[in-house]
From Swiss-Prot:
Family membership: Belongs to the RNA polymerase alpha chain family.
SMART domains noted in UniProt: RPOLD
GO BP terms: DNA-templated transcription
Domain of life: Bacteria
Name assigned to this protein: DNA-directed RNA polymerase subunit alpha
Lineage: Bacteria, Pseudomonadati, Bacteroidota, Flavobacteriia, Flavobacteriales
Keyword tRNA processing: no
Record keywords, A-Z: DNA-directed RNA polymerase, Nucleotidyltransferase, Transcription, Transferase
Record organism: Flavobacterium psychrophilum (strain ATCC 49511 / DSM 21280 / CIP 103535 / JIP02/86)
Length: 330
């Protein structure tokens, strides 16, 4: 249904943009829509985008986070607070995490930049950040893990079973967006002056540029709002009242389509891409066509070839109509 005389922008205007800061205008908007759109995008920008951070460390001679290190000015808690601020940008396409062993000696001060030569898959974006001050005679040996994540994750959620003795799990700030501001200004269209202009200012850590950050945030919102389209809205009471019967072939297909992808022999990279897109089962997978899959973040041709083979082996096809299998019902 067309929206009668509904004023909406036809594009986003980029006023200024670097790798770290960007300013954007969205106009004209109907009265009240500046706040509606601005607040939603700001929340997603600050909490839902993926980034990279340290999730655990292991320092030689240290048993827990309340320890002190002989010859080092800062205690371990202060060192952890500094490590939480180190920002990373992925340098190698297929890497989402990396375990790093660091051995530094002969220095009075260690900065984040000193880690770079020990890291192969990521670039340190704030090399000037001071990690600790120490006696130059002290050897500083540490292992740390860099991982991909979203938003803020507390140390408790980063914990893994069977971790080595002395491993300290840290809080992780994955979000690549440092700050978001938006302002709503009056905007004139012909003789009407009560329309709105939404102005966004976005600052990132450099691992993603502001334009891409805004695009990714919009995609997150679109993915959620699509669920409210007519074909996705059903009346639960009607569904419960319906009685259904399935032939043997349909039952077999339902069972197959509900198979979890983690139970398939897929590469970690393919699984991570699908998980990020909330594609959990074979049914979820084949509901997309190949062009849709290629739009997933970090999804490449190798992953598509791998999934193409899996779908063919299972005698399925991409873009299948799954409605008759009623996968949303037990």
């Amino acid at each position: 249904m067309a929206l009668f005389n509904f004023q909406k922008p036809d594009k986003v205007i980029m006023i200024d943009s670097t790798d770290f800061e960007g300013k954007f205008e969205f106009r004209p908007l109907e009265p009240g829509y500046g706040l509606t759109v601005g607040n939603a995008l700001r929340r997603v920008l600050l909490s839902a985008l993926e980034g990279y951070a340290i999730t655990s460390i292991r320092i030689e001679g240290v048993d827990h986070e309340f320890s002190t290190i002989p010859g080092v000015v800062e205690d371990v808690t202060e060192i952890i607070l500094s490590l939480k601020q180190v920002r990373f940008k992925r340098q190698i396409e297929d890497i989402d995490n990396e375990s790093v062993t660091i051995a530094i000696s002969g220095k009075n001060q260690i900065t984040a930049g000193d880690f770079q030569k020990y890291i192969s898959g990521f670039q340190v974006l704030n090399p000037e950040l001071v990690i600790c001050n120490l006696d130059s005679k002290v050897n500083f040996n540490m292992e740390m893990t860099i991982e991909k994540g979203r938003g803020y994750v507390p140390a408790e959620e980063n914990k893994k079973q069977n971790a080595a003795i002395g491993t300290i799990f840290t809080d992780s700030i994955f979000t690549p967006v440092k700050n978001v501001k938006y302002a709503i200004e009056n905007f004139r269209v012909e003789q009407k002056t009560d329309y709105e202009k939404l102005v966004f200012e976005i600052k990132t850590d450099g691992s993603i540029n502001p334009k891409d950050a805004l695009t990714e945030a919009a995609k997150v919102l679109i993915h959620h709002f699509m669920l409210f389209s007519d074909e996705r809205i059903t009346l639960e009471a009607d569904e419960i009242a319906q009685t259904e019967s399935y032939d043997e072939e349909s039952l077999h297909m339902r069972q197959l389509l509900k198979t979890k992808l983690v139970d398939m022999d897929l590469s970690v990279r393919a699984l991570n891409c699908l998980k990020a897109a909330e594609v959990d089962t074979l049914g979820d997978l084949v509901s997309f066509n190949k062009n849709d899959l290629m739009k997933f973040r970090n999804f490449g041709k190798k992953s598509l070839t791998e999934l193409d083979e899996l779908v063919a082996i299972k005698n399925l096809t991409f873009g299948m109509d799954l409605a008759k299998y009623k996968l949303d019902k037990e």
